[in-house]
UniProtKB/Swiss-Prot annotation:
Protein name: Orotate phosphoribosyltransferase
The protein's role, per its UniProt record: Catalyzes the transfer of a ribosyl phosphate group from 5-phosphoribose 1-diphosphate to orotate, leading to the formation of orotidine monophosphate (OMP).
HAMAP family the record matches: PyrE (MF_01208)
Family per similarity comment: Belongs to the purine/pyrimidine phosphoribosyltransferase family. PyrE subfamily.
Taxon lineage: Archaea, Methanobacteriati, Methanobacteriota, Stenosarchaea group, Halobacteria
Taxonomic superkingdom: Archaea
Quaternary data: Homodimer.
Binding site for 5-phospho-alpha-D-ribose 1-diphosphate: 93-94, 97, 119-127
GO biological process: 'de novo' UMP biosynthetic process; pyrimidine nucleobase biosynthetic process
Gene: pyrE
C-alpha cells in the first residue's frame, strides 16, 4: 500500500479495513452500550501504513497549532502526526498521577496557546470533552477536535455544546456503507 500525499476518505477507509480494524459481532463499548461492529484502534494504531495515512490526513488539516492526544489511545496518533506536521504536542492524562511531576498535561504548553485535540474514535464525545476541559483549565485555547472515526452516536453534538468543532476523517457511515455485516 502506497501512502497517498493527501489521503481521501476512501484511502482512510481502505487503510482501516486493510489493518483489519473493523470487526463484527456483539461488542460492549466504553460507554456501556453494545454494538454490532467494533473499530479496534489498537490494530490501526499499530499498523505503520495505516498510521502514516491517518497522520498525513490530520497534518493536512492542521495549521501552526500545538497538538494534544488523549492518553493512552491517541498517543500514537498525536506522536506520528506531530512528526509529519512538524508541530509540537502534549499528552492529556485522564487524571493527574500522584508521582513524578503530578501533571495532567504532559509536555510544554503555554497559556493562551491554540491546541487541537486528536482522538481515535468518537462515540459519545465524553473523553474528548474531558481533554478539552483539562487543556482549557491550564489556559489553552481549544476550539477543534479531530477524530479518526466518528461513530455518529452523539460526540459531535456534545462537543458543539462545549463550543468545540469536531472534524472526523471518516464516519461510521463512510466505513460501513458497503458492508452487509451490520
Amino acid at each position: 500500500m502506497t501512502i497517498p500525499q493527501s489521503p481521501t476518505t476512501e484511502d482512510i477507509v481502505a487503510a482501516l479495513r486493510n489493518a483489519d480494524a473493523v470487526q463484527y459481532g456483539e461488542f460492549e463499548l466504553s460507554h456501556g452500550g453494545t454494538s454490532a461492529y467494533y473499530i479496534d484502534k489498537y490494530l490501526f494504531e499499530t499498523d505503520p501504513k495505516c498510521l502514516q495515512i491517518i497522520a498525513s490526513a490530520f497534518a493536512d488539516r492542521i495549521n501552526e497549532t500545538t497538538l494534544a492526544g488523549v492518553a493512552l489511545g491517541a498517543v500514537p496518533l498525536v506522536a506520528v502526526t506531530s512528526t509529519v506536521a512538524g508541530q509540537p504536542y502534549v499528552v492529556v492524562r485522564k487524571k493527574a498521577k500522584k508521582y513524578g511531576t503530578g501533571n495532567r498535561i504532559e509536555g510544554r504548553l503555554n497559556e493562551d496557546e491554540e491546541v487541537v485535540v486528536l482522538e481515535d474514535i468518537a462515540t459519545t464525545g465524553t473523553s474528548a470533552v474531558e481533554a478539552v476541559n483539562a487543556l482549557r483549565d491550564v489556559g489553552a485555547t481549544v476550539e477543534r477536535v479531530f477524530v479518526v472515526v466518528d461513530r455518529q452516536e452523539g460526540a459531535r453534538e456534545q462537543l458543539e455544546s462545549n463550543n468545540v468543532e469536531m472534524e472526523a476523517l471518516v464516519t461510521a457511515t463512510d466505513l460501513l456503507v458497503d458492508d452487509e455485516n451490520v
